[in-house]
A protein has these predicted regions:
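Conserved ABC ATPase signature
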Residues: 4-7, 213-258, 262, 266, ...
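The conserved Walker
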Residues: 10
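Electropositive, glycine-dotted interaction segments
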Residues: 72-210
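C-terminal lobe/lid and adjacent interdomain/linker elements of RecA-like ASCE P-loop ATPase modules
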Residues: 263, 283-373
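Short alpha-helix of the ABC ATPase nucleotide-binding domain corresponding to the H-loop/switch region
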Residues: 277-282
Length: 373
């Protein structure tokens, strides 16, 4: 799938998907100076409590490592399934399986049983075992430890997470500007590409974006605008943080797309359509589709504009809503049967056919101060 979307009302828990991806990457890549990676990346996360705050949560992800070649047994498809089950104090389970041409093979399993870890390694596992097991703390990932020791199997998944999974920041503040600064310094030729990207979205008054230094001597993103008046065409410049929130977000999306257009990446964007016009939103998706690099865009949003006809495949759209116990339930659009080819998914969603709509009720502000007087 080139693109995929999770759509639902505010407060439905859509973003828990993104937070889980961030948590896994944070735990696996935690530096040595972080005393307890589990507490740092699972604390205050709604998905992390399982059936209670003291019981482990479980996160599992499938990673396509190799598409393989159909009919060629020497080049099978390989899907890595990495799973963690942990509280903020320790791992209770950690496992890596490879699904090779549909056949599930264990690489490693780590389980907490009777106060100690029990390990199991498959015959296809390549890497250090006994010494790595003996030294591993309860709050550290075996995948990380094995990869840093050069373990071939662990390194395949570790390298994929490092190089290909990218969760985009919201796109407004200093973190977003740093991403853009780093991209422009590494790829100065992208400056003109960003301008062209903005022009494609009808932002036509910008003619230059570059790295400059502000009054304090610090690097910042400088944006040059032009305008027409009675004297002719004139120009003025602004820094990134003085631009509108929507323009900052578009520039960040542009550089993240360029990364994905240059090498295979998985871009995950939360609140994708925030501050963006629906037409701009859909055209951004079309721009991503038009590129031939085998990268993937996964977005989370409230905006039903993503349901416009022929924008995304049915099996790439998921709806999110709160269940009876306030847990988030995800349902694929492809699970709904009887949808006619000519039927508008967009209209059907707004009519409530697929659920995942906000349930509204009346609200009346109670001015208690006035009532008491």
């Amino acid at each position: 799938l080139k693109t995929s979307a999770i759509i639902g009302p505010n407060g439905a828990g859509k973003s828990s998907f993104v937070r889980a991806l961030e948590a896994v990457k944070g735990i696996v890549f935690a530096s040595e100076d972080i005393q307890n990676p589990l507490r740092k990346y699972l604390a205050k996360s709604a998905f992390a409590y399982g059936d209670g705050k003291t019981r482990p949560c479980e996160i599992s992800m499938d990673i396509l490592l190799d598409k393989g070649e159909a009919g060629n047994e020497d080049k099978p498809s390989i899907i890595a399934r990495y799973t963690i089950k942990a509280t903020q104090e320790r791992f209770y389970e950690e496992s890596l399986y490879y699904i090779i041409n549909g056949s599930k093979k264990v690489m490693f399993e780590r389980k907490w049983e009777d106060g100690e870890y029990v390990y199991r390694f498959g015959k296809f596992y390549r890497g250090e075992k006994k010494r790595q097991v003996a030294k591993l703390p309860e709050d550290r990932s075996f995948l990380q430890g094995a990869a840093l020791k050069g373990g071939q199997t662990a390194l395949e998944v570790y390298s994929w997470l490092d190089a290909k999974q990218d969760v985009l920041t919201l796109g407004y503040g200093a973190n977003a500007e740093k991403v853009i600064l780093d991209s422009l310094k590494a790829h100065p030729e992208w400056s003109d590409q960003i301008v062209s990207f903005l022009w494609a979205l009808d932002v036509t008054d910008i003619f230059r974006i570059q790295v400059i230094r502000n009054d304090k001597g610090l690097e910042t993103v400088g944006i040059s605008h032009c305008f027409v008046n009675a004297k002719g065409t004139e120009a003025y410049g602004q820094t990134f943080m003085n631009e509108s929130l929507s323009l900052r977000r578009l520039i960040l999306i542009a550089v993240s797309f360029f990364e994905a257009f240059s090498k295979e990446k998985i871009i995950v964007i939360d609140d994708f359509g925030q501050l963006l016009h629906p037409y701009v939103l859909t055209h951004i998706v079309e721009i991503f589709h038009a590129n031939d690099m085998e990268s993937q865009l996964i977005v989370v949003d409230c905006n039903p504009a993503l349901l416009q006809k022929d924008l995304m495949r049915k099996d790439s759209i998921w709806f999110a809503e709160k269940g009876e116990e306030s847990s988030t339930e995800f349902v694929s659009l492809s699970d709904f049967r009887g949808i006619k080819a000519k039927q508008s998914i967009y209209d059907g969603y707004l009519q409530g056919i697929f659920g995942a709509l906000p349930i509204e009720s009346d609200f009346c502000f109670q001015n208690k101060v006035k009532e008491n007087n």
